[in-house]
């Protein structure tokens, strides 16, 4: 199981975490670890005319998101994304496990880099009421409970294939020596084709894309938090044959080289 306190505190997926507005991760509600990895809850109140751009290298997964204007299922991203925040607002999101996504969409490949509006007025009202509480911490916790109660009622326990897809996610996310699809197949004791089917059905991305996303997230984190490490050192630690291959993957997904990312970091972006 990959959801834990340490993971709640890390900055993977967020390219400039210190530029975020108020942002909290909450653990998955009790009994829902197989369906929800964690909850994420940002809130912001920015000066008039000010825009805060949040740049994200998303996890290879989908999110259920409740915002003031409704509920959406945000599908798996194939590239870096951003959102421009202004004024005041909030969101309550659940990073979904593969087993949960299968019950919300039959083919998540169709919602890559897209959002699907969900007709869930009761969930929206309950979370919005929670987030309107004067005491923000109590509001977050109440919103998390409401979303958890909805998930418990709406999403069944993982199927056998869903549990296997979760195990695949756990393996890829936690073992940085995994760099090729045949390694996943061997560890799960299924065929390469079986891994491909699991990834397509339960995540909506090719398995190699899932592997590379986790490695790129880790690469970005280390480039940001360990400025004395060379790009070549990071590449070697993450199983790349050389830094050129890491740089190529980095450019393909993020649109810029690892060295450019490191140069874009100011003193306030580092721990």
Predicted regions and their residues:
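Alpha-helical bundle regulatory/interaction domains
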Residues: 1-192, 202-206, 221-225, 230-241, ...
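A generic alpha-helix surface/boundary motif
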Residues: 193-194, 214
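DNA major-groove recognition helix of helix-turn-helix
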Residues: 199, 211, 249-251, 262
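Amphipathic alpha-helical "recognition" segments
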Residues: 208-213, 217-219
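Positions that flank functional sites
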Residues: 215, 250, 266
């Amino acid at each position: 199981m990959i959801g834990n306190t340490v993971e709640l505190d890390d900055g993977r997926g967020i390219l400039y975490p210190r530029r975020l507005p108020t942002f909290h991760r909450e653990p998955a509600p009790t009994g829902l670890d197989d369906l929800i990895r964690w909850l994420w809850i940002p809130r912001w109140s920015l000066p008039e005319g000010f825009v805060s751009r949040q740049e994200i290298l998303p996890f290879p997964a989908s999110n259920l998101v409740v915002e003031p204007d409704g509920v959406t299922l945000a599908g798996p991203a194939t590239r870096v994304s951003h959102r421009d925040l202004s004024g005041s607002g909030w969101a309550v999101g659940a990073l979904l496990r593969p087993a949960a996504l299968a019950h919300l969409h039959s083919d998540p490949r169709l919602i890559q880099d897209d959002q699907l509006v969900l007709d869930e007025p009761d969930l929206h009202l309950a979370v919005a009421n929670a987030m309107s509480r004067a005491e923000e911490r109590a509001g977050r916790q109440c919103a998390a409970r409401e979303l958890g109660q909805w998930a418990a009622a709406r999403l069944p326990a993982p199927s056998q294939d869903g549990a296997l897809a979760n195990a695949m996610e756990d393996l890829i996310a936690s073992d940085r020596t995994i760099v090729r699809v045949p390694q996943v197949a061997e560890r799960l004791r299924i065929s390469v084709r079986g891994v491909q089917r699991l990834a397509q059905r339960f995540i909506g991305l090719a398995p190699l894309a899932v592997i590379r996303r986790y490695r790129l997230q880790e690469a970005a984190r280390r480039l940001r938090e360990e400025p004395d490490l060379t790009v070549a050192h990071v590449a070697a630690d993450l199983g790349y044959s050389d830094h050129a291959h890491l740089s190529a993957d980095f450019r393909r997904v993020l649109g810029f080289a690892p060295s450019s990312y490191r140069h874009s970091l100011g003193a306030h972006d580092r721990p």
